[in-house]
Amino acid sequence: MTEPLTNYLGKPASALLASPPFKFWPFERSVEEDLPERPVDYVFPQHGLELTCDNDEKIHSIFLKSDSFDQALLDIPFSSSRSDVLSLLGVPSKSGGAHTHPILGEYGAWDLFARPGHAIHVGYRADADRIRMVTLMRADVVP
């Protein structure tokens, strides 16, 4: 799942930005000036893709949102159930159940799959048994 995208983890954002189809997608770049490490974010609002980079612009996390990310770039449909994901990716290294945050509202269950050099976090919808978001992270930034 998402193997080509995981290859961008740890590489400069410019590598992804120069590659198809991403080089054709409009994006917004911002720097979080209020934080000491000053991370750089790239948001592709029309395509459900977000990148978070170190201050040297090396990608440490890639967020793929089910409502607008191009399904052709994933090996698993966002319509997959949690059991479908577990069948494909195996036993998760960590999991969490659905919960309600007093301010942010309902969150669905989630699973984290550790891989050599990176991790795959799959968040599920609170209102349906399907994927809400997939996050790819370098191993050194996994919470």
Q: Each predicted region: which residue ranges?
A:
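Charged interaction scaffolds used for protein-protein
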Residues: 58-60
